[in-house]
Amino acid sequence: MRKNSAKVTAAVLAAAAVLSACGGSGSSTTTAAAGGSDTAAAETTAAAVADENATYKEELHIAVAQQAPSLDLHKNSTLIARQMMDGTVWEKLVTQNANAEAVPELCESYDVSEDAKTITFYLRKGVKFHDGSEMTADDVVASMNRWIEGFSSAKSTVGDARFEKVDDYTVKITADHSILLLPSMIAGAAQPAAITTAAACEKEDSNGFMTDYIGTGPYKFSEWVQDQYVKLERFDDYVPYGTKGEPMDGWAGYKAAPTKVLEFDIVPEETTRVAGLETEQYDIIYSVQNDDVPRVEGMDNVTVHSLQAGTIALVFNHKKGIAANQYFRTAVNTGLDMDEILTACYGEGGYELGSCYMDAAQAFWNTDAGSENYNQKDPEKAKEILAENGYNGETFKILCANLNNMDYIAVAMEQELEAIGIPTEITTVDWATLTDYRKDPDKFDLYITSFAQVPVPSLKLYFGPNYPGWSDDATLAEKFEAMNTATTMDEAKTAWEDLQAYSWEYLPLINAGHYIANYAWNSDIEGLNTFSGLYFWNAGIKE
């Protein structure tokens, strides 16, 4: 048996703190403005430790750029929902450490069989839900199986296998093939494997979304006023894990919740977010545009943190319309200049070019397979492809959101595509509407989105045939399955390289490059966790 215990040594945690302070793989930087120093800022973000002897300001106000369509993480892949709820309201069987490895959270330990077909999780005892009930195997089985049904990547990984109860504090899943990568999927999925009560799994609205947000995390759901804010309140009966006073290892470890209330204020306009930070209306703001970073860095007592946060994706509609044709996707990919379209959105320095579908922090999975088809910026060749295949000038429909300047990408694409003879039609909506529109194949030929970092390629949602874009290709599915069913990590890496090389031919999407996310906060805040995002489990301002 392959044993994965819950034990985390102080030496490992200390190493993780150093790694976090240095920016991990080199894709993260923190700058303190006039009120602090670079060293102090790095130490603050690395430690993520609350002072139990201090008194903290009662509320933190966090200004975010958009509203989530739902807070049901089982069926919602939007980043903002995860940033609000994952690890805060809901926790998982396992989570990620600083090396992007799956380590216990709601389980004491887990075993992977030698053939990697069976995984057994041994649950922590005495963990309380926000409704006061104790977490048992019945809740975990209901939650995990609901997650599998709602998450195409998990479903394709496990096939017909589902979680089952062994006893009140043990669950397992057994497949007819290797599910080696499943723990990593649980730890870092874009649709988190949140554990809730069995009863909550049964209560859904007319859209199939959960209506009761009951978790085990250090904060409980309080209120959601549409288009205004989401409020979370500290759960005083939270049962922590890890060692009090020691820094977190990635997302794993002790959560003290020193702040009573976390309020996520929905503020679409960046200028309003920045102004609110300056006047201290907001303590933390998301989505600082790259061009505005120098100005925000110049504010008194403000810290700016930047990191490579994910990929910019141009997702084709494979089900219907002109982009369902392979030749057309190839022509579009051949003609586009990624520097031009990314500069339009992020400005210089706000992105990094790169053909790898994975991000810099996932060093094990980095590959240049298929890179010869990336950023060709060859409009003449694109014209030839269109002419050879009888393209007759059908309009190309681009769907985008007026979020973080993503609509600027659409305008830059329009100019480049029309130069090679492709007339375009741009539909610009808010983010919540885009997530609804992209479910309708009649509304777009391509939509523009971004994908946050994930620990394994299995979590790239667009490889699933049910994800909007509908890449229902037999060869793609075969190569994806080969990776997911590998019995060793080396086999999985080889299969991934083969999958990425084919993807740059088939084009489930165009990976335009990697975006840099900028956050800013009041430098008086202590205990922020900046591993692969921004998290508030130990964050607060001392009074």
Protein language model annotation of sequence segments:
Residues 63-114, 145, 214, 511, ...:
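N-terminal lobe/hinge region of extracytoplasmic solute-binding protein
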Residues 64-84, 106-108, 133, 181-192, ...:
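A structural "hinge/loop" feature
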Residues 108-153, 166, 172, 322-324:
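Aromatic- and charge-enriched surface segment that lines or borders ligand/interaction sites
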Residues 111, 115, 156-202, 207-225:
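Surface-exposed binding/hinge segments that line
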Residues 136-143, 170-172, 217-218, 256-261, ...:
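Alpha-helical secondary-structure segments
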